[in-house]
Amino acid sequence: MTQRMDKRFADLKEEGRPALVTYFMGGDPDFETSLAIMKALPQAGADVIELGMPFSDPMADGPAIQMAGQRALKAGQTLVKTLDMAREFRKGDQATPIVMMGYYNPIYVYGVEKFLDDALDAGIDGLIVVDLPPEMDDELCLPARKRDINFIRLATPTTDEKRLPMVLQNTSGFVYYVSMNGITGSALPDPSKVAGAVGRIKAHTDLPICVGFGVKTAEHARLIGASADGVVVGTAIVNQVALSLTKDDKATADTVQSVVTLVRGLASGVQTARLAAAQ
């Protein structure tokens, strides 16, 4: 639903701080643990949840997220189960926006119309499908928009002034600015360059700009959040899950709590981001 996403960003604008957008892989390391992580994220400080859809060939993802996807698939995670996870979450939380993130192939195999109907029923607010360019909007973007599901696009440092309006044309919810070229989990970008890029995109759209790739600590979140409307953290969370597991990739008593601790720290950075910008 577009209203839930719009309300969240409007409320945060009133508070004078950026959003903390947290990504985790659905089903990693197993369904129950992953669901427990998802349920714990809002209380830990997450404002928007990105729910990863595991896929066997995740070309844009770094090793950490690739391995998380493999763990999830090995544990039996499917697109049906990922939707079920969102549905279970919604029983206790009607306020936190959920964005499903992944690749087109599993959705295509599932059936686009059925997927969108089921996503709406499960309480999904938006989609990020990294391998569907604007030229393919008829495939999924426009049908999603007709159902009031946001379709969130990625912009990069190489998205030039000519390309940017096309990227933004049917985008809703927010714009995800990938602050560095390459795969997920790369080094932290230069905050001043990020601020310049955010300003450049804002000249073309009123949508919130969320910045990701490379944010791992509260200080990173504070620096990026000084100019962005949202700070996206994914690889750091996925790495924390991996570090908490046994040698055979099973959850431990510390798995959920270790993610909560990390996210609380990141949230503290986001909450002081505007103070940093004002100094």
From Swiss-Prot:
EC top class named in words: lyase
Arranged from A to Z, the UniProt key words for this protein are:
Amino-acid biosynthesis, Aromatic amino acid biosynthesis, Lyase, Tryptophan biosynthesis
Q: Which residues form the active site?
A: E50, D61
Say if the entry is tagged with keyword Lyase. yes
Domain of life, per UniProt, equals: Bacteria
GO cellular component annotations, sorted alphabetically?
A: cytosol
- Reaction catalyzed: (1S,2R)-1-C-(indol-3-yl)glycerol 3-phosphate + L-serine = D-glyceraldehyde 3-phosphate + L-tryptophan + H2O
Pathway membership: Amino-acid biosynthesis; L-tryptophan biosynthesis; L-tryptophan from chorismate: step 5/5
Among InterPro entries, the record links this protein to: Aldolase_TIM, RibuloseP-bd_barrel, Trp_synthase_alpha_AS, Trp_synthase_suA
User: Pfam families, alphabetically?
Assistant: Trp_syntA
Per the UniProt entry, the Enzyme Commission number(s) are 4.2.1.20
Q: Which GO terms describe its molecular function?
A: tryptophan synthase activity
* Quaternary structure and interacting proteins, as annotated: Tetramer of two alpha and two beta chains.
The family assignment reads:
Belongs to the TrpA family.
What role does it play?
A: The alpha subunit is responsible for the aldol cleavage of indoleglycerol phosphate to indole and glyceraldehyde 3-phosphate.
Protein name according to UniProt:
Tryptophan synthase alpha chain
